[in-house]
Amino acid sequence: MSKRKASKYKIDRRLGENIWGRPKSSVNRRSYGPGQHGQRRKSKVSDFGIQLRAKQKLKGYYGDVTEKQFKRTYQEASKMKGDTGQNLIGLLEQRLDMVVYRAKFAPTIFSARQVVSHGHIYVNGVKCNIASRRVRPGDVVSLGKKAKEMALIAEAQALPEREVPDYVAADGDKVTFTRVPTLDEVPYPVKMEPNLVVEFYSR
């Protein structure tokens, strides 16, 4: 198992929050970070530390995308009209792997990325294996024939703690991305603070 693949299981513990709202999260059993020094008494966190943590939490939630990808997305958001934090959230929610996750075509964002990379997802009838692909309002995302029979899909759709948000219109084995959501519309299990992410990169 690669270090990057193994690290995903430590994201919740590192942040001390169950960022995906998973019943089996290790944070539900212990709230301190991973490693032998995880139980040390917490010291006062600086403004920089607070901003860094907000960035790590948001980046981690979206499948722990690389810093290069995340910063590039932020830079794009900062050049758009309107609030940069809101723009950042909108761009992240437009990722194909995230739309697949929101549609409950996969139980986790990591498995959603895998479903895309293995060629099981179609956008407007055309196969797409690029997880970071930008989905536009009106685009239809659907499952391939083989994917419809995968146990992974049935597992995801049976999860009671997750609902398909309003900006993803579900219709059987396909969904339509209806609009770019605002921060308040995104069903985060924990509080996200994109304004602090903006402050982090604006230093």
Swiss-Prot record:
A cellular component annotation (GO) from this entry: small ribosomal subunit
Molecular function per GO: rRNA binding; structural constituent of ribosome
Region (Disordered) residue spans: 15-46
Pfam families documented for this protein: Ribosomal_S4, S4
Record's keyword terms, sorted: Ribonucleoprotein, Ribosomal protein, RNA-binding, rRNA-binding
GO biological process: ribosomal small subunit biogenesis; translation
Highest taxon of source: Bacteria
Domain S4 RNA-binding: 94-154
SUPFAM superfamilies membership: Alpha-L RNA-binding motif (SSF55174)
Subunit note: Part of the 30S ribosomal subunit. Contacts protein S5. The interaction surface between S4 and S5 is involved in control of translational fidelity.
Matches recorded under HAMAP family: Ribosomal_uS4_B
Entry function: One of the primary rRNA binding proteins, it binds directly to 16S rRNA where it nucleates assembly of the body of the 30S subunit. With S5 and S12 plays an important role in translational accuracy.
Family membership noted in the UniProt record: Belongs to the universal ribosomal protein uS4 family.
Protein's UniProt name: Small ribosomal subunit protein uS4
